[in-house]
């Protein structure tokens, strides 16, 4: 809450600012909270608010703003000996044009951070390998077939899961098929290449390529599998399907099922003299790759979960 020119800044007002940044940077609840340890803390009623108090608060604001946008908050450093004003600070009237050092400037900076709490600047994150599954044996053909890659993502607790996604974390999916030269092999390779990388964040699942995403993210998961993404084949192989399903096993464990459905039942490709539809196997090497985008660095860094394969391709 802003203060009026001429008013004293009370412990309660400082604590109000500190509480708001703690909601974003600390444990929080729901879509608030990155799970970080703050430099600032509450002060006691009647305490004089010092430059050191504001230095610690500024540290927390700068870390949060950097995490979100890559720059420090629009506030100045308050030096020892300065008087903290409503909209400026200084040791005498002549220096009160320092317009980023007042209490209200800090108040406004916290407001920006609250608005941008779910943003993540790319420079404050890392894309990291999580798990993979690979198959070299032929599959599909002969009337259809499905191979699956199922894995769990285990967080330390429900808060750690929430902090991972609140801080901009994503679980990412991609796949490739190499080797082999059949037309079905080629279609699967094209399907997997064209879908790009699939990204599940806090509230949605999208892809960098083509396919059907959903408005289902971490906060929408239940104890029952939900389809969060799909991508179909094309032409003669339009029935073939790559699909991702997701559910929560508990408040701290997510489970994903990635299936590759060879639903094509064969097409009459043989020309004159053919005996009927031909349904080829899928050959070559099929790889399902899982990565994560995680908030990292000196501003906000969240713990990585553990990835465990429970079914391989």
Regions found by a protein language model. Give the residues of each.
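Extracellular "spike/adhesin" assembly and maturation modules
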Residues: 1-136, 140
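Detector for Asparagine
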Residues: 15, 22, 53-56, 62-66, ...
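Long, charge-rich C-terminal accessory regions
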Residues: 111-253
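Extended, charged low-complexity segments
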Residues: 203-313
């Amino acid at each position: 809450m802003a203060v009026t020119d001429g008013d004293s800044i009370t412990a309660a007002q400082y604590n109000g600012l500190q509480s708001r940044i703690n909601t974003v940077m600390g444990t929080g609840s729901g879509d608030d909270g990155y799970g970080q340890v703050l430099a600032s803390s509450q002060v006691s009623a009647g305490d004089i608010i010092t430059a050191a108090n504001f230095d610690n608060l500024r540290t927390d604001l700068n870390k949060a703003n950097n995490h979100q946008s890559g720059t420090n908050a629009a506030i100045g450093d308050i030096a020892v000996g300065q008087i903290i004003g409503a909209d400026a600070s200084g040791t005498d009237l002549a220096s009160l044009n320092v317009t980023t050092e007042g209490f209200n400037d800090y108040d406004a900076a916290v407001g920006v951070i609250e608005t941008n709490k779910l943003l993540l600047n790319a420079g404050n994150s890392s894309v990291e390998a999580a798990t993979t599954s690979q198959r070299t044996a032929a599959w599909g053909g002969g009337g259809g077939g499905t191979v699956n890659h199922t894995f769990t993502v285990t967080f330390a607790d429900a808060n750690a899961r929430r902090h991972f996604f609140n801080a901009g974390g994503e679980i990412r999916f991609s796949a490739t098929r190499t080797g082999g030269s059949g037309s079905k092999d080629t279609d699967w390779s094209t399907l997997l290449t064209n879908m790009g990388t699939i990204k599940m964040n806090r509230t949605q699942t999208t892809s960098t390529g083509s396919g059907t995403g959903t408005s289902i993210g971490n906060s929408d998961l239940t104890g029952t599998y939900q389809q969060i993404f799909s991508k179909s084949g094309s032409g003669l192989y339009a029935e073939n399907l790559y699909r991702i399903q997701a559910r929560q096993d508990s408040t701290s464990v997510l489970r994903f099922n990635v299936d590759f459905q060879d639903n094509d039942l064969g097409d009459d490709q043989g020309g004159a003299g053919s005996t009927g539809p031909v349904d080829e196997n899928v050959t070559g090497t099929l790889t399902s790759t899982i990565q994560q985008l995680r908030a990292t660095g000196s501003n906000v860094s969240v713990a990585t979960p553990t990835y465990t394969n429970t079914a391989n391709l």
